[in-house]
UniProtKB/Swiss-Prot annotation:
<dbReference type="GO" id="GO:0042274">
    <property type="term" value="P:ribosomal small subunit biogenesis"/>
</dbReference>
<feature type="repeat" description="WD 3">
    <location>
        <begin position="120"/>
        <end position="159"/>
    </location>
</feature>
<comment type="subunit">
    <text>Part of the small subunit (SSU) processome, composed of more than 70 proteins and the RNA chaperone small nucleolar RNA (snoRNA) U3. May be a component of the proposed t-UTP subcomplex of the ribosomal small subunit (SSU) processome.</text>
</comment>
<feature type="repeat" description="WD 5">
    <location>
        <begin position="204"/>
        <end position="242"/>
    </location>
</feature>
<dbReference type="InterPro" id="IPR015943">
    <property type="entry name" value="WD40/YVTN_repeat-like_dom_sf"/>
</dbReference>
<keyword id="KW-0698">rRNA processing</keyword>
<feature type="repeat" description="WD 2">
    <location>
        <begin position="78"/>
        <end position="117"/>
    </location>
</feature>
<dbReference type="Pfam" id="PF00400">
    <property type="entry name" value="WD40"/>
</dbReference>
<keyword id="KW-0677">Repeat</keyword>
<dbReference type="InterPro" id="IPR019775">
    <property type="entry name" value="WD40_repeat_CS"/>
</dbReference>
<feature type="repeat" description="WD 6">
    <location>
        <begin position="246"/>
        <end position="285"/>
    </location>
</feature>
<dbReference type="GO" id="GO:0006364">
    <property type="term" value="P:rRNA processing"/>
</dbReference>
<dbReference type="InterPro" id="IPR036322">
    <property type="entry name" value="WD40_repeat_dom_sf"/>
</dbReference>
<dbReference type="GO" id="GO:0045943">
    <property type="term" value="P:positive regulation of transcription by RNA polymerase I"/>
</dbReference>
<feature type="repeat" description="WD 1">
    <location>
        <begin position="36"/>
        <end position="75"/>
    </location>
</feature>
<protein>
    <recommendedName>
        <fullName>U3 small nucleolar RNA-associated protein 15 homolog</fullName>
    </recommendedName>
</protein>
<feature type="repeat" description="WD 7">
    <location>
        <begin position="287"/>
        <end position="324"/>
    </location>
</feature>
Length: 517
């Protein structure tokens, strides 16, 4: 009796992802270094001047870390409650931070005691920053106000009350020291001019705004809130340029790289890098939800702060380190490996015993061996198989069709199993690799269940979608055939024409050859 032949599953080449220079650039980072903080890391800010230390705001402290250090080189612990929004001044010598108690503190990087305290907010101050002149501080608070303070005298210069909900994001202009942008939980993004005290532009984000960001040219503005990242064209009066929805949860922060590429981070634990056309070119995965994100100048490091109090820093690999890693060689085999069996000499009376190779069959092959065709199809349509290895499901269908039992396997299905088959058809019937056997399945399903389709609205809806997909595919095939006909005509017109001698001329030439002979 011949042995059972397992189902032959065709192997298809895997299409790798398109690797671009930007993808390689952002993959060129070491594994992250993780530092445990005292609470959720709400803000990270790099100093604009070398050695590019960065401030980390977490719990009731603001720590200053060196670019390659894992221990803080400076601690600011004068906060009685949670600290927020620690930010450097343009020269990297001063730092400002808000707090849950409503106070804003100004620190000298070289000292520990606060130089100034700005009092005036009645609720928590989540966003603080220096205006570009360096002599004024901007703050946004949960008391619905945005205020400007004088650094020298600690006096409030102006207060703006146009927002109707918490102000959680601010972005001062670097080109004009009197202009800044705010984002609020009232779903609006506003641009203000300190000289007038009123907003000069308003954009509707549509979700509570968590972060606002100005491009260096200040022609574009980025706002994040909810699952959306929106880019606004300020030169066109705040017109929306693009709306991105690549995250699954709230986008909490955004920043720009040295080449002005946009990076966004979300509660879904992903950092996404966009190119100039706002397509995702790389992802960084983190262990917990992300609250803060910052990129060092020249992209030397990417720092991420998370809700579980972990600060994660990825440093860029340098050429010397790459050469050191690639230059290592694996240890070669030992001497005993080479001399093993060297002195063995087979004898003439040796008897060679071949060990039989046991054949291991898959579950669907065992069922096919027992002629359980319906169970074999059910096994091939299991969730993991049909989603990760559709070629296995199609191979079982082709084997059933070869045996002539495909119709029997598809018959007698309930609504749940029929829904699985139809969903598989919807997903893969337009795939050129699987279209021929799946079209056969579709014909058999229509023949078997045509009378009972109206009884199930789910099956009827899936069949309607299948009908629409096949209609679009037929239209596409028709258009491709038309294009093929046009190309054939063009190629035929471009081909050089060959002159064909007439019958009379050929006969005269033959007669002249005979006379000459």
């Amino acid at each position: 009796m011949a042995s059972f032949k397992p189902t032959k599953v065709l192997s298809y080449p895997k299409l790798g992802e398109k690797v671009t220079e930007e993808t390689l650039y952002w993959k060129n980072y070491k594994p992250p270094v993780q530092i445990k903080e005292f609470g959720a890391v709400s803000k990270i800010d790099f100093s604009p001047l070398p050695p590019h230390n960065y401030a980390v705001t977490a719990s009731t402290r603001v720590h200053i870390y060196g670019l390659h250090s894992q221990e803080p080189i400076r601690n600011f612990t004068r906060f009685h409650d949670t600290a927020y929004g620690g930010s450097f001044r343009g020269d990297g010598k001063l730092l400002v931070a808000g707090s849950e108690e409503g106070l804003i503190r100004l620190f000298d990087i070289g000292g520990r005691v606060s130089l100034r305290q700005f009092k005036g907010h009645s609720k928590a101050v989540h966003a603080t920053s220096f205006l570009s002149d360096g002599f004024r501080v901007l703050s946004g608070s949960d008391d619905l106000t945005c205020r400007v303070w004088d650094v020298a005298s600690a006096v409030e210069l102006s207060s703006i009350t146009e927002h109707t909900d918490y102000i959680r994001a601010i972005a001062p202009s670097k080109l004009n020291p009197d202009v800044f942008v705010t984002g609020s939980y009232d779903h609006t993004v506003k641009m203000f001019d300190v000289r007038s005290g009123n907003s000069v532009m308003t954009m509707q984000h549509g979700q509570p705004v968590e972060c606002v960001l100005l491009y260096p040219s200040e022609a574009l503005l980025v706002s994040t809130g909810g699952r959306y990242v929106k880019v606004w064209d300020l030169l066109k009066g705040g017109q929306q340029l693009v709306s991105l929805k690549n995250h699954h949860k709230t986008v909490t922060c955004a920043c720009l790289s040295s080449s002005n590429k946009l990076l966004t981070a979300s509660l879904d634990r992903h950092v996404k890098v966009y190119n100039s056309s706002y397509k995702v070119v790389h992802n960084f995965d983190c262990a917990s939800s992300i609250l803060s994100l910052a990129v060092a100048p020249d992209d030397e490091a990417v720092a991420v702060g998370m809700t579980n109090g972990v600060l994660s820093i990825r440093h860029r690999k340098h050429k010397e380190e790459k050469e050191a890693l690639t230059g290592r060689r694996k240890r070669g085999p030992s001497y005993r490996f080479f001399v093993k069996g060297k002195n063995f000499v087979p004898r003439q009376d040796d008897f060679l015993v071949s060990k039989p190779v046991r054949q291991h069959l898959q579950k669907y092959d065992k069922q096919l061996k027992r002629f359980e065709v319906s169970k074999a199809l059910d096994t091939a349509l299991e969730t993991w198989t049909r989603t990760t290895k559709p070629e296995v499901t199609v191979a079982v269908i082709m084997e059933l069709n070869r045996r002539g039992t495909l119709k029997n396997a598809l018959a007698g299905r309930d609504e749940v199993s029929l829904t699985k088959i139809l969903n598989f058809l919807l997903k893969h019937i337009t795939d050129p690799r699987f279209s021929r056997p799946l079209l056969t399945v579709g014909d058999i399903v229509l023949d078997l269940y045509q009378q009972v389709i109206p009884q199930s609205p789910v099956v009827e809806r899936l069949l309607q979608r299948l009908y629409e997909i096949l209609g679009r595919e037929a239209e596409l095939q028709q258009e491709l055939l038309q294009v093929l006909g046009i190309l054939d005509t063009l190629f035929a017109s471009l081909m050089p024409r060959k002159e064909v001698a007439s019958f009379g001329a050929a006969a005269a030439a033959q007669e002249s050859q005979l006379q000459a002979a």
